Regions:
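Conserved glycine(s) in the ABC-transporter nucleotide-binding domain "signature"
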Residues: 1-132
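Anion-binding and metal-coordination hotspots
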Residues: 3-5, 11-14, 105, 112-607
Length: 607
């Protein structure tokens, strides 16, 4: 027996039903459903807490139903017996398991409004191929088994019910063009559905930039008009790779809400500086989504007067780190001064002040803004910086002790240039002269200033009244977006290996964005199912790691048996049991039909 929801004139009713194999009026063997008990309207019993229906089903399954009227039926369901006959030569004699991941993924995809969106795009564009099916297949494939677009299309037959109805696999490349053109619609639809389903949490919006490298022989060329003026910059350009690769890259800027759910992203040529991505990304996405006022939290690479003016002019605020090593001497001196710190001598101490800065906005006009500057010193941060620079500082001391005994490598030469008093380079070769001449040129004041800033960090904010520790805590939430990038580069294997054109690169990244958002929504449900003690003591947690969710959904399969029966595989315990509990899916130890599996999908509570 199972609990189901029936809709009667707009009112949802709970009822207890029992399904069994039987014979209908025409004498055909089929599934017969019997309504055992009409429980009553859902609104009468719903306690207002998250996922009431899932908890009710779980309580009935565990023998402790939340509704007293169900107690007489606990454990009374008759045990169905099914006879399966294998006939030699029947294909079902040899197992051929198919994926069931779409039982959970389809409701999440639909909850984001993407099925309706792509159906509308298909209708308006008079597309003949299965656009929605292709987007689903590409997205689910990116979650479960990342591969090229062609290889992902070949995965269609791995699902119990194929996701794509059209047979022409080449349509996937046409679909990529459509996805690229629909980017703004996708962002708006997903944001609207998330806001309606779980409530978008835009009080804090995180932003950061990563990049992806391409193994191609040369960067993309710019497109110029007849006058030689650049009308479109090439996308795959040489830049500073996050993975230290000397190959063309594409920049990606990602926005994230305070729940850890992605909001939108923007792509930029690889030679675009990080702080030049913020304003275009905001204008193209978050500025158009009608979000309530939020605090933009970003790393020091995003800080510039022009960027901060744009954030303020849009009615928002900001919390952004600012490099102390690139600050003025007066700012550094104030940070190092012991006066003003809340806990002098402690392993973590901070202080703040309000300053007035003159900056220029996007139009070049001079503006005056007031900011709160928060500086803190952390012993943990100090130890980390000291370890990171230990090898170089040790080299400098050994160089002092024995200058004639060193040959300076190219890497050491680059590091040393920051700490020399004058020009000690060979103008013809560009190399540093021998160690005996170099050691006398080391600027001890610069070296001391470098060491003095170990452990210090500076944050600026528009929120003049916000307590210092709250500013620091909100800034530290930026680690969530770093986890998004790790998930994209590992579990989702986002690096665009098999796409070439700008449109297809953008579409590929959009598929990865949708997959990442779905992953976070699934993890959010698992975190709720794991209870309040899960992750206790951590600053934050997404629940079950993304790689484990992908593996669990990939391995949840069904094997076809004679007579239209299906045996579920890898569906009993561990992470899959947590997923079932999280989404209110009641999977029992029995054989299933395709109708039963459809019922499981309809019972999923995506938000």
């Amino acid at each position: 027996m199972h609990i189901e929801v029936a809709n009667n004139n707009g009112t949802k009713y709970l009822r207890l039903a029992h399904c069994r194999r039987g014979t209908n009026r025409k004498g055909v063997r089929t599934i017969v459903k019997q309504i055992v008990l009409n429980i009553g309207p859902l609104s009468r019993f719903d306690d207002g807490k998250p996922d009431y229906l899932g908890r009710l089903r779980a309580s009935f399954r565990d023998g402790r139903p939340l509704i007293d009227a169900l107690k007489p039926y606990v454990g009374d369901a008759p045990k169905a017996k099914t006879t399966v006959t294998f006939v030699e030569g029947d294909a079902t004699c040899i197992g051929s398991p198919r994926r069931l991941a779409d039982v959970i993924l389809d409701p999440v995809f639909e909850a984001l409004g993407l099925d309706e969106l792509f159906a509308s795009v298909k209708h308006d564009s008079k597309i003949r191929y299965d656009l929605t099916g292709i987007v689903r297949l590409l997205t689910y494939g990116r979650l479960l088994d990342p591969a090229s677009k062609s290889a992902t299309m070949a995965q269609n037959g791995k699902y119990l019910r194929p996701l794509v109805g059209s047979a022409n696999d080449d349509s996937v490349y046409d679909a990529l063009d459509v996805i690229d053109r629909s980017a703004a619609k996708i962002f708006r639809r997903m944001n609207t559905k998330i806001a309606q389903g779980i409530g978008r949490s835009p009080k804090v919006v995180f932003y950061d930039v990563t990049n992806f490298f391409f193994e191609i022989p040369r960067p993309d060329e710019d497109v110029a008009d007849e006058s030689g003026d650049v009308v479109e910059r090439g996308l795959r350009k040489m830049g500073v790779s996050k993975e230290n690769r000397r190959q063309p890259i594409v920049q990606l800027g990602l926005f994230l809400d305070d729940n850890g759910i992605p909001i939108s992203f923007g792509t930029f040529p690889g030679n675009t500086l990080d702080h030049h991505t913020l304003r275009p990304a905001m204008k193209a996405t978050v500025d158009t989504l009608a979000l309530a006022r939020f605090l933009l939290v970003a790393d020091r690479g995003m800080y510039s007067g022009t960027n901060m003016c744009h954030v303020l002019d849009a009615g928002n605020g900001y919390i952004v780190s600012k490099s102390l090593r690139k600050s003025s001497r007066a700012e550094v001196a104030w940070a190092l001064e012991a006066d003003g710190y809340d806990k002098p001598g402690a392993d973590f101490r901070c202080k703040s002040r309000i300053v007035t800065r003159k900056v220029r906005d996007e139009g070049g006009r001079e503006r005056t803004i007031r900011e709160k500057v928060v500086v803190y010193w952390s012993r943990a941060f100090y130890e980390r910086e000291r370890r990171e620079n230990e090898s170089f500082l040790s080299f400098v001391e050994r160089l002092r002790a024995n200058p004639a005994g060193f040959r300076i490598t190219a890497a050491q030469s680059k590091s040393l240039r920051r700490f020399v008093k004058g020009d000690v380079l060979d103008k013809k070769t560009g190399k540093i002269l021998d160690g005996t001449k170099l050691v006398a040129m080391i600027d001890d004041e610069k070296l001391k200033a470098f060491n003095d800033l170990f452990g210090y960090y500076q944050i600026v904010t528009s929120e003049l009244e916000m307590p210092d520790r709250e500013v620091i805590d909100k800034y530290h939430g930026l680690t969530r977006i770093e986890d998004q990038f790790r998930e994209m580069k590992s579990t989702l294997e986002t690096r665009p290996v098999y796409v070439r054109t700008r449109e297809h690169v953008n579409a590929h990244l959009m598929i990865c964005f949708i997959a990442l958002t779905m992953m976070r929504l699934i993890q959010r449900k698992t975190r709720q199912a794991l209870g309040p003690d899960f992750g206790k003591g951590l600053d934050w947690t997404y629940g079950i790691p993304g790689a484990r969710i992908a593996e669990t959904l990939r391995e949840w399969q069904a094997n076809e048996l004679p007579g239209g029966h299906y045996q579920m595989l890898n569906a009993s315990d561990g992470d899959i049991a947590t997923l079932f509990r999280a989404f209110g899916v009641d999977v029992r130890a029995r054989l299933y039909t395709k109708g039963d599996i459809r019922d499981l999908k309809s019972s999923v509570s995506p938000f």
